[in-house]
Amino acid sequence: MSMNNITSKMNQDSYGYFQLHMSDFTRVSLSIVFTLVFLVGIIGNAVIIWFIGFKWTKTISTLLFINLALADSLFLIFIPVYTVYVLSNFHWYLGEFLCRVSSFFFTTNMYASMFLLTFISIDKYLTLTSHRLVYKYRKYRNYYVCIGAIWCISIALGVPTLYYKRVILSSSRNETRCISYYGDDKHTAITIYRIIVCIRFIIGYVFPMTVILLSYALIVYKVKFINKPPNRSFMITTASIFVFLACWTPHHVLNIISLYGLKSTSMYNYIKESIPFVNAIAFVYSAINPIIYIFVIRLTSTYDSDTMDELRSALLDEETTSTEDCSDIEISDISR
């Protein structure tokens, strides 16, 4: 359906698509935050990808972390698009292709980051508690398949965003917006919106968070009995998961609130005006991961040590530990 047909078939003002306006100070402040997040994130993740991908020994741990950095980078490269949108007071001038693709990447890489963190949590638990299973299945081929499946699922979950995003023109206000358009019938549109929000909340937040919390609870329980302190790779993952939840929880909470606020004009306006601020918090996660790595390494290293060498050692420590643990398994046990 063309943009003109969409314009003629829906009463856009009744949906509230074109009432979002901010003060110049707020828009400029948000744009500065987005710009800083973009610069810090792109540089930081590029450094991580460069060292892990091209300088260091390849291990399963580095394979997981480089995919996490890749997901963050793909998320970050479209932040300038959103920054322009905010600076232009939410008038969309960049065409429908960028409207669809930027939203698709935001959604896909949100899922990819969460699923990768979930997979890393499961990997940490199995590495610590199931030596036979690790010895048998912790192979590159198996992990490539799992990571490939994570990306395929994330892309599939991002397809609805790609499909429903539209550039909508208001002839009465002479404004354009990049919005999710679910059809002319309001009841159908609200139903589709609620389904998408519920899928995003359950599959992209509740289920992964439950698996992560369960994995870490079991890890803590196990550590109490084996009297073995967590390694630095475990600490890095824990910090990254904590920050992810802190940054993305407001986004999901706001989406759930929106399910109950669609019939209230005041609540709808509050939700709509909160979106840029909630997005700003979510964007921070993709930029802060490299800072988390450095922060944890500096806390656990000597003052004069090289940060990147220490990070490399932290990721390799887990591989060494896993190998040593597996070497304790008797050959008769392996052959069963």
Swiss-Prot record:
Main location: host cell
Residue intervals annotated with topology Extracellular: 1-31, 85-101, 165-200, 262-276
Glycan attachment positions: 5, 174
Keyword list, A-Z: Disulfide bond, G-protein coupled receptor, Glycoprotein, Host cell membrane, Host membrane, Membrane, Receptor, Transducer, Transmembrane, Transmembrane helix
Gene3D superfamilies named among the record's database cross-references: Rhodopsin 7-helix transmembrane proteins
Listed InterPro entries: ATII_rcpt, Formyl_rcpt-rel, GPCR_Rhodpsn, GPCR_Rhodpsn_7TM
Keyword Glycoprotein tagged: yes
Transmembrane segments: 32-52, 64-84, 102-122, 144-164, 201-221, 241-261, 277-297
Signal peptide: none
Record's keyword annotation contains Transport: no
Cytoplasmic side: 53-63, 123-143, 222-240, 298-336
GO cellular component: host cell plasma membrane; plasma membrane
GO biological process: phospholipase C-activating G protein-coupled receptor signaling pathway; positive regulation of cytosolic calcium ion concentration
Membrane topology of this protein: Multi-pass membrane protein
UniProt-recorded Gene Ontology molecular function terms: complement receptor activity; G protein-coupled receptor activity
Disulfides per UniProt: 99-178
Pfam families: 7tm_1
Localization, UniProt: Host cell membrane
Protein family: Belongs to the G-protein coupled receptor 1 family.
Name of this chain's protein: G-protein coupled receptor homolog FPV027
Taxonomic placement: Viruses, Varidnaviria, Bamfordvirae, Nucleocytoviricota, Pokkesviricetes
